[in-house]
């Protein structure tokens, strides 16, 4: 039987349609909500789902699969669970949680999923990076050897931080923990403007966990007024955000910082603060019916912080020589550094800056307890001139505290003890610094040099801050810059500041 040309054409068309009929279908694995409440959804039917995979509910809300059990999957919801009902469809996305990263993020405020919340529109050209990745291995790393200047005399001289280090800032509420972190960001402005190439620039990522929205807005204003937003990224999971977002925010910020580290640049990531992340994780774990341990935290709360902080690293020259420095913040209760979370993070980090309430109220700000604060690797990264200048000051301060405690009994002291008390009082006064006024490292060297070498010994304590401003204007700026060289303070270099310091001391005695 022969078809007419028109019929033959229709037959061919039908055959091709039937052949390609199934090609446009996309098969998704779906499940159904068994129960929902307190931000946790139990879903039946997602048999092939991966741990940590993103899912999407019928209402458009996203979630992450954390508990993979025989009968159902425990999913924590990123957002309000009021729109999710029993029996709703849940679709696998097939992707593990990822966030945008790249230079397009600089100057922006984003949430824990990398969605902009600053009203400046969508992000421009960027790449996406996994939130949870393995930390660099031993072979890919190099020991910390470059300084990361904070602009604070007390930190840069006594507890120096290197690029690639993890230095904990720990203290009670209202002791100035965030102030140290913000000063460090502000100090990078003049450090970055001095850098000749991209590999010297330090980009900052500030992760706000469980803070008030007004506090985050205030921080954005401070950074924008100081033109510091141009090299900073803010990740905000505020107190009004659900616990899963507060848990995720540090990992998101870390992934954004790792873009710079892995491309031969330098990043500083501030986690403010990890105590609130641990509380959010405890809330999620208890709602997922995971067994509680000490202080009702789950058994893997140590791993929660260790896998995050191990991602801070100084890369070897073969892998680009980039670095990411971590400054985690922990809030203590009534100065108890031996609680569960503080001891965990102290054991993970490479040192800690301890802030104390009584030091703060004595007017010593930043309120650093020099005896408890330590930097385990930072001295290898400290500038040679700074190391020469403040080498003995930590020991002198320790002796001063010992003698000062003894002197309270009012017994007569010999001349040596009185000299030690006198010098110690000056060495305690010199590191004081107003908030949001970081000092360039070469100026810090001059000020500390004057204090350590006895130029302030006969000066009233209340005139030291005026003297500090005066000597910085008298010392030759070229000489100050020469302190940054590898040679440090040679005998020839010491002679010129000695003469200037002697002369400028006279009006303040």
From Swiss-Prot:
UniProt-annotated location(s): Mitochondrion; Mitochondrion inner membrane
A family per Pfam: ATP-synt_ab
Binding site for ATP: 171-178
Keyword Protein transport: no
Site positions for Required for activity: 373
GO annotation, cellular component aspect: mitochondrial inner membrane; proton-transporting ATP synthase complex
GO function term, MF aspect, one: proton-transporting ATP synthase activity, rotational mechanism
Keywords attached to this entry: ATP synthesis, ATP-binding, CF(1), Hydrogen ion transport, Ion transport, Membrane, Mitochondrion, Mitochondrion inner membrane, Nucleotide-binding, Transport
Protein role: Mitochondrial membrane ATP synthase (F(1)F(0) ATP synthase or Complex V) produces ATP from ADP in the presence of a proton gradient across the membrane which is generated by electron transport complexes of the respiratory chain. F-type ATPases consist of two structural domains, F(1) - containing the extramembraneous catalytic core, and F(0) - containing the membrane proton channel, linked together by a central stalk and a peripheral stalk. During catalysis, ATP synthesis in the catalytic domain of F(1) is coupled via a rotary mechanism of the central stalk subunits to proton translocation.
Subunit record text: F-type ATPases have 2 components, CF(1) - the catalytic core - and CF(0) - the membrane proton channel. CF(1) has five subunits: alpha(3), beta(3), gamma(1), delta(1), epsilon(1). CF(0) has three main subunits: a, b and c.
Similarity remark: Belongs to the ATPase alpha/beta chains family.
Name this protein carries in UniProt: ATP synthase subunit alpha, mitochondrial
Organism, scientific name: Triticum aestivum
Name of the gene this protein is made from: ATPA
